[in-house]
Amino acid sequence: MSLVPGQHCSPSHTRLHLTSPITMGTEPATQNTEFSKGSLIYGVTSPQRGHSQHSEASQGPLSLDKPLQLPPIFLEGEKGESSVQNEQEGEPSLQSPSLELQSPAWPRHAGVAQEPLKVSSSYLSDTQSSESHVSSVQHPRPEEGSHASLSSGYAGDKEGSDISLVGSHRRVRLNRRLNTQAASNQTSQLGSIDPPSSLKSRLTGPAHSTKQTGGKE
């Protein structure tokens, strides 16, 4: 069996090295082949053993570090969280009496709040009455505004509608009186003028006198 140095073996992919030279012959060749087989077997198996030892060595510190380092951290974290939860659970128990004490105080505050509402409503009624009084002073009643409109002579407000109607009737009466006075004056002037019969008599009077005088002549 001849082996070339540096040849790769397909199943294990390991490099095989021969330490002793191969000689031609029967006995030495068999010895060398046996020795080479043993070396090959040792070379093939030795990396596996080394790998297994390396894996065991690599796994050893990890298996020792895990139970020593990691669990205390988790335990401390769990203890801290549990203590925080206990504190948070203890705070509502302390605050609950204050809430229970504050609950019966609501009706008192409500009663106190209702009293100012009553006061404010009375105050509002007073202010409304005062505002109504001011508005009545600023806007007088129609009866009171009649004198003011008559004195001022302005009859454009809605409140003084009756006054404006009364004033219009008075003006109409005055106009009628003026018209009647003018008509009476005209009639008096016409009455002062002589009637047509008198005019005729005046015209005919001189004619008769002339005739009479002519007949006498």
Swiss-Prot record:
Superkingdom: Eukaryota
Identification of the protein by name: Protein TNT
Pfam families: DUF4694
Compositionally biased spans, kind Polar residues: 20-36, 45-61, 177-191, 207-217
Biased composition range(s): Low complexity: 91-104, 128-139
Region span, Disordered: 1-217
Tissues expressed in: Preferentially expressed in teratocarcinoma rather than in normal testis.
